[in-house]
Amino acid sequence: MDVRPLAQGLEFPEGPVALADGSVLLVQIAAGAIARISPDGTKTTVARPGGGPNGAAIGPHGKCYVCNNGGFEWHAEGVHRRPIGQARDYAVGGIERIDLETGNVECLDRVAGEVPLKGPNDLVFDVEGGFYFTDLGKVRARDMDRGAVHYAKADGCFITEVAFPMVTPNGIGLSPDEKPLYVAETEAARLWAFDIIEPGVVRKEPWPSPHGGRLVAGVGGYQRFDSLALDAEGRICVATLINGGITVISPDGRHVEHHPMPDPITTNICFGGPELKTAFITLSWTGRLVAVDWPVPGLRLNYAR
């Protein structure tokens, strides 16, 4: 695949969102900021929520909804950096709503019931206007949280836990018919599916499923899964760490193919362009946003601008 650089010098980019004008919205986790990358590569800061803005999605009324993980500590190697655990000044994670015109940041959710959100990571809106999101949790020197999937309404009036416990749940996406919900676990490098009964309610598989999900695929060797997007034919495109690239998995898990990228920390993918056949991919170790011509159109997201 021909990889075309769009922007460089980004501070651990993630959460790309393709906009109708050809620009790409993304987060810079290490800078605590949201930026817009124009087609010519110009970077404009949109908002500075602080903490660790992670996944992003456009929701109702054109607002940008962001999973904020609360922040990381960082290990630097020359110009490169990678997260190594919970920030020293970490307080809590949460869901934030950002006005892209003014940069105003509103906090929507900090708890789910009586459980604090630890490290919200990625989110996807359904056709009803609510959104599913992963809470990966936080990693410390000697222990780590067990993660969960939640469902919330865009106005902040409702949130419920959908699945627990999970091992570092990260990327999340809905199938074209919004029946299966897909969740990627980072450390286990597994892709799970949850069959949706109604918004915020999924059918639970019996034991030995640890959380009620149905295993779609796992990959061998030392690899880790990050965020994901679906194509129009229902295949799940998972950003893959260590073996840097995009792993494409069929809905039944029988077909798995890997598209290498020039970065071991390939963290996220979204689709844009006139026919949704341009994949925008964040290469976080090297601080770049790149574009790739994709053989299949991406799935159009609800509320896409």
Language-model segments: which ranges?
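Sequence-structural signature of mature extracellular/luminal beta-sheet repeat domains
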Residues: 1-305
